[in-house]
Amino acid sequence: NNTIILDLSTTLADETINFANQLNKKTGASWIDAPVSGGPDKALEGNLAIMVGGDEEVVEYVKPILEEISSKFTYFGETGSGQIVKMINQIIVLNNYAILAEAASFAQAWNIDANKIPEALCDGHAGSNLLNDLFPRIVNRDFAPKGYASQILKDLQMVSKLANAKNTPTPMSSLTKQLFTILLNSSQEKLDGTSIVCLLYTSDA
């Protein structure tokens, strides 16, 4: 069977491994886990970052497809490794929602014009794509859904499960998971992750 399934979704690594093994055993098909990062805008531009796991020869065969939809893809090894790296990506990205919300709340408390922060810090160590993208939306309370809070919580729950499997402490992710749980329990709306700042503002001043 020459069938190749290229999975760009984010799933638990152990589930990916089990499914890929069963699929190959029953049908002979190959499974490549290739979760992506970059968001809707990068997807439209074909500039996603892709983390790849699976048989190296099969990955080489689908390389033209990966190159077409990404600015960069990186092969990490056996099936499931792409999903593990995606969780590393999520640890960095999703905790930044809470960190940037805290920074915005701190700026507000001291009457600092937070809209100037991304440009002010762009050439320092704090400068990042996340600061440029998320911080203005947090400051201006632009909560139009781009990264749903419910999806963020789901991914943080996945991080927790994988960390527990290896007895790896993830205190930052655990706290961020608690914050998003509180946020989602407080509203029935489809909230963007940037609305996490609503838990931190002490007033509307």
List the predicted regions and their residue ranges:
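Rossmann-fold dinucleotide-binding core
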Residues: 2-4, 10-90, 94
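Helical "substrate-binding/catalytic lid" subdomain
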Residues: 81-199
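Conserved small/polar residues in nucleotide/adenosyl-binding loops
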Residues: 201-205
